[in-house]
Regions:
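Catalytic active-site module of serine/aspartate enzymes centered on a nucleophile-bearing elbow/loop
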Residues: 100-139
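Short beta-strand/loop motif that positions the catalytic acidic residue
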Residues: 70, 76-78, 82
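Short alpha-helix in the alpha/beta-hydrolase fold that links the catalytic acid
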Residues: 63, 72, 85-95
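A generic structural signal for alpha->beta connector loops
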Residues: 71-73, 99-100
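Alpha/beta-hydrolase-fold enzymes
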Residues: 1-45
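Nucleotide-sugar-dependent glycosyltransferase donor-binding/catalytic pocket residues
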Residues: 83-86, 114
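Conserved active-site and cofactor/substrate-binding residues in soluble primary-metabolism enzymes
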Residues: 26, 45, 49, 88, ...
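Active-site nucleophile elbow and catalytic-triad environment of alpha/beta-hydrolase enzymes
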Residues: 46-66
């Protein structure tokens, strides 16, 4: 299997990368603006150390009883159309978190939910606001 999925490989055409991240070309253009204005914010591919640490942390989270012990309220947001992460895994793990809620989108959303077209982005922002109001009301 290839080490990179289409659009993840460093140097992939920006049009491919854009489609994987968002349906909103203006919000993707914002990323390109910042890459040009502040080149130091542009990230390259992960280091081997990062990959090793990610694998180890995933291994630890997979252990029985670990996610089940987390009692902090957690709002997860994902899309079944995500081409970068395993949405089935997010759904499965959300069921292991005793105090979590999952907002799941379909083909209307790509990976970057808060950089999506307004209907999706607005739903996310609204749900985040309501989540805080419900779970951490102002005193």
């Amino acid at each position: 299997r290839a080490a990179w999925k289409e659009g993840e490989k460093p140097g992939s055409p920006l049009s491919v990368r854009a489609k994987i991240l968002t349906h909103d070309s203006r919000r993707y253009a914002d990323e390109l603006y910042w890459w040009e204005a502040r080149p130091e914010v542009r990230l390259g591919p992960p280091s081997w150390h990062w990959v090793e640490r990610a694998i180890e942390s995933t291994r630890q989270l997979n252990a029985p009883g670990i996610l089940e012990k987390i009692t902090t309220p957690i709002l997860l947001m994902a899309t079944t159309a995500d081409r970068l992460v395993d949405t089935q895994r997010i759904v499965r793990d959300s069921k292991r978190l005793p105090n979590s809620e999952l907002l799941l989108f379909g083909n209307e959303a790509a990976h970057e939910l808060l950089r999506e077209a307004d209907p999706v982005r607005d739903m996310c922002l609204d749900r985040i606001s309501r989540f805080f109001e419900e779970r951490a009301p102002k005193q």
